[in-house]
Amino acid sequence: MGVPAGDVEKGKKLFVQRCAQCHTVEAGGKHKVGPNLHGLIGRKTGQAAGFAYTDANKAKGITWNEDTLFEYLENPKKYIPGTKMIFAGLKKPNERGDLIAYLKSATK
């Protein structure tokens, strides 16, 4: 099916509502319950410096891109069993597309 083209502004709203309590996106942003996501695209799982990842995240060994994020964000615990991310996921493909569009722009 592919990743739907997303709307950055809608994605930003989703991030604020669903992600910002645990993640930051800006360069040099602090880790919260979840890691800072700056530089996410092109980074391997479990690689944000200074964040204590689960072994499951470190061992997954995939590189974050549109396709891997699209699958992960639907159901994080299914994609990486053992992750400590408590987010249930975004079931609607267009919402995942919007969030990915935002993450691509906000984490460069």
Curated annotation (Swiss-Prot):
It comes from Drosophila melanogaster (Fruit fly). The keyword Nucleotide-binding does not apply. Binds 1 heme c group covalently per subunit. The gene is Cyt-c-p. This is Cytochrome c-2. One of its GO terms (molecular function) is heme binding. Coiled coil: none annotated. The lineage of its organism: Eukaryota, Metazoa, Ecdysozoa, Arthropoda, Hexapoda. Pfam families: Cytochrom_C. There are two cytochrome C genes in Drosophila: Cyt-c-d (distal) and Cyt-c-p (proximal). Transmembrane segments: none annotated. The keyword Protein transport does not apply. PANTHER family: CYTOCHROME C. It is found in: Mitochondrion intermembrane space. Heme c binds at residues 19, 22-23, 85.
